[in-house]
Curated annotation (Swiss-Prot):
Top-level taxon in the UniProt lineage: Eukaryota
Name of this chain's protein: Fungus-induced-related protein 16
Length: 49
């Protein structure tokens, strides 16, 4: 379980960092729109649509 949480943390960190470098402020869209960064991963594991 600890490994899973660490993996999620790493994924969110990497996706948020990549979102910053994406055009259009991808970091702000994380976790909701599923377009940039962690939004894609979170949307895949826990779809809230």
């Amino acid at each position: 379980m600890i490994v899973y949480s660490v993996f999620i943390f790493a994924v969110l960190a990497i996706s948020s960092v990549t979102g910053i470098f994406l055009p259009g402020g991808g970091g702000k869209k994380c976790g909701g729109h599923g377009e940039y960064g962690s939004g894609v991963i979170i949307g895949a594991e826990r779809p809230k649509k």
